[in-house]
Swiss-Prot record:
UniProt-annotated binding residues for [4Fe-4S] cluster 1: C64, C67, C70, C114
GO biological process terms held by the UniProt record: photosynthesis, light reaction
Alphabetically ordered keywords of this record: 4Fe-4S, Chloroplast, Iron, Iron-sulfur, Membrane, Metal-binding, NAD, NADP, Plastid, Plastoquinone, Quinone, Repeat, Thylakoid, Translocase
Biological role stated in the UniProt entry: NDH shuttles electrons from NAD(P)H:plastoquinone, via FMN and iron-sulfur (Fe-S) centers, to quinones in the photosynthetic chain and possibly in a chloroplast respiratory chain. The immediate electron acceptor for the enzyme in this species is believed to be plastoquinone. Couples the redox reaction to proton translocation, and thus conserves the redox energy in a proton gradient.
Coiled-coil region list: none
Species whose genome carries this gene: Nephroselmis olivacea (Green alga)
Boundaries of every 4Fe-4S ferredoxin-type domain copy: 55-84, 95-124
Protein name: NAD(P)H-quinone oxidoreductase subunit I, chloroplastic
Cofactor note: Binds 2 [4Fe-4S] clusters per subunit.
Location of the protein in the cell: Plastid, Chloroplast thylakoid membrane
Cell membrane keyword on record: no
């Protein structure tokens, strides 16, 4: 008789503990249901990157002195700098400069260590192409003026969406 009561008591404790775990799971689920969604409608809405965002590299050909510091500080020796030495003025003359964004890890070392500030990071993050060889940008493509998300009239700019705390659903537009 006592074995039956102890097994019944154990069963009740385990059932109560299981109900508690299920209640905790539902609590987390309902908590997340009241938060703002993280996803956006991409082609029609685009995120505005932060100021420190490291996107496509912009290159200014006229400022470059062909010192190759960018190549030396790059962890994968990525920038290809082609130059000629002019004996008359005893100076390097830059012929071409290219970066393959299919290999680039966007660490920003080249931008940080450039002595003439001819390299800068832009807020462009749409670099998708059908052929990976199109990701090899020469100095002409790198010198293209970066486009801003805010300037596009067909797109609704969205400020950065972080993981929002509780009660932020009511602030949706």
């Amino acid at each position: 008789m006592f074995d039956f009561l102890t097994s019944l008591q154990t069963y009740r404790q385990e059932a109560a503990q299981a109900a508690q775990y299920i209640g905790q799971g539902f609590g987390v689920t309902f908590d997340h249901m009241s938060r703002r969604p993280i996803t956006i409608h991409y082609p029609y809405e685009k995120l505005i990157p932060s100021e420190r965002f490291r996107g496509r590299i912009h290159f200014e050909f006229d400022k470059c002195i062909a010192c190759e510091v960018c190549v030396r500080v790059c962890p994968i020796n990525l920038p290809v700098v082609d130059w000629d030495y002019q004996k008359s003025v005893k100076k390097k003359q830059l012929r071409s400069y290219s970066i393959d964004f299919g290999v680039c890890i966007f660490c920003g070392n080249c931008v940080e260590y450039c002595p003439t500030n001819c390299l800068s990071m832009t807020e462009e993050y749409e670099l998708s192409v059908y052929d990976r060889h199109e990701l090899n940008f020469d100095h002409v493509a790198l010198g293209r003026v970066p486009t801003s998300v805010v300037q596009d009239t067909l797109v609704t700019p969205v400020l950065g969406l972080g993981y929002l705390p509780k009660g932020e659903l009511s602030s949706l537009p």
